[in-house]
Amino acid sequence: MQRVILVVLLLSCMAVLSVRADNSEMLAPPPRPEEFTSAQQLRQYLAALNEYYSIMGRPRFGKRGDSFRKREFFRTNGERYPEDAAAWTEFQ
């Protein structure tokens, strides 16, 4: 029984890796010709480049962790602010 589970796990890993490898060609930028011979060729290249950057330039939310931890870097002289420094009741 353990061999069957191991074989199924191995085959699923290989299937996932093969699917990921097939999509890797989509991540490559379009090939740039040595010389543009016509305006149409330049338009096609720029359209392909625009499509590439529209896919690759999308923000990936949640991949960088908690950005609030970085606020400590911008404080001068290590000063600390109280948690309730700006309570809404003070402005009413």
From Swiss-Prot:
The modification Phenylalanine amide is found at F61. Its main location: secreted. Residues 1-21 form the signal peptide. One of its GO terms (cellular component) is extracellular region. GO terms for biological process: neuropeptide signaling pathway. GO terms for molecular function: hormone activity. It is found in: Secreted. Keywords: Amidation, Cleavage on pair of basic residues, Neuropeptide, Secreted, Signal. Belongs to the NPY family. May play a role in the regulation of viscermotor functions during egg laying. This is Pro-neuropeptide Y. It comes from Aplysia californica (California sea hare).
